[in-house]
Amino acid sequence: MKRIIGDGEFSGTGEISRPSMSKFEKYFEIKKITDEHSLKKSFSLRHKVYCEELGYEPIRESGLEYDEYDTRAVHLCVIHKKSGIFAGTVRLVFDSDQQELPFRRLLKNFKENVEDINVARLKKNRMCEVSRLAVPTEFRKRKLDDKLKLNFSSEEIKCFPMISMALFYGCLTYCKHYEIGAYSMMEERLARALKISGIESFRVADFHEFNGLRAPFLFSSSFNTEKIRPEQLRILNYVYNSVIEKEKTITAA
């Protein structure tokens, strides 16, 4: 397994490869949210997905879905370049002395001993949870109705499955860069799908019914680049440069 991250590009061979544009990069932008306007768009998208489409949360008059964890979270979004539409969003919730991570509170409701989940051995400065990943229905479907087909080319539609993957790449490159451990409450099929994309994790507690059977998974601190297809590597490079390299530039300014 090659474990590579840093300046330049990821490569399955362990070498710095020449930059090449992914199809995803051609049509979509990924970025860390740093302004209130974009954050409200993220909350609006979450309301559309979690409240209106899936019914996981109650409908709110404001049309915004947010909670007490958002004030101590880093938010990422994917934007469709041509239209400016938010195609996906996700957050990284950080732990604190005052408030535990969302999944730990959930497990306590199921009377599971969360103290058995020992994170000290990870030697991480902090821990976080990947949550509230939201991709609206028009970007989740591979087969669109005639009306939506007028808005997207066939090549753009082929990129739709990459949106969720790019958001996970963004979260985990951020965590690796800042030496933060990351959990997520996931269905087993999502954990398997992420593994194919080079994102490995292991389950740290039992499955429970929570909008489907889900369990907390702890992500590996490295990407398994030998399992990633060339197009996925290009997306990973693009995400790293968009999220981490851009943050380095802002910090240095």
Task: Describe the residue ranges of each PLM region.
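An N-terminal domain-start capping segment
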Residues: 1, 86-105
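A short beta-turn/loop motif at secondary-structure boundaries
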Residues: 65-70, 207-211
